Regions:
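Glycine-rich phosphate/adenylate-binding loop
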Residues: 8-128
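Conserved SAM/SAH-binding loop
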Residues: 1-7
Length: 128
């Protein structure tokens, strides 16, 4: 469990990656790390067949802070557990996260938000 009391030395990395199940927990992790000296924060979200990846540059944190503050678990439809555990979506998500890490380490700027709708076969990229 990561919160404000978690020593930064246990989390310290230039790239922090999270994949959490609720907005409440995402907000807790964000509060624990937002003022720390990381370079990138990658926050992954997955539904049955849709994957989202927020890529937060350490020099541009305000947009994510504002976006996350406006979200609440009660506003997000709950999917049945079996719909959340779609292995091919998780595999695609892992590949997209790996690609984003490669972009960062090779000096490319990844999109702020990547949404991959697997059913429709559509990848939407915002910012970057």
């Amino acid at each position: 469990r990561v919160d404000r009391s978690t020593p930064w030395s246990l989390m310290a990395s230039p790239i922090v990656i999270s994949a959490l199940d609720s907005i409440k927990v995402r907000k807790g992790v964000w509060e624990a790390i937002k003022d720390k000296p990381w370079m990138w924060y990658l926050e992954a979200r997955m539904g049955a067949e849709v994957f989202q990846l927020h890529a937060v540059n350490g020099d541009d944190r305000d947009w994510y802070d504002q976006m996350l503050a406006s979200q609440d678990d009660s506003l997000i439809p709950d999917e049945p557990c079996t719909a959340k555990a779609t292995i091919y979506t998780a595999c695609i998500a892992a590949g997209q996260i790996g690609k984003t890490v490669r972009q960062i380490v090779t000096g490319e700027k990844p999109p702020r938000l990547l949404i991959h709708d697997i059913v429709k076969g559509v990848i939407t990229q915002i910012g970057g």
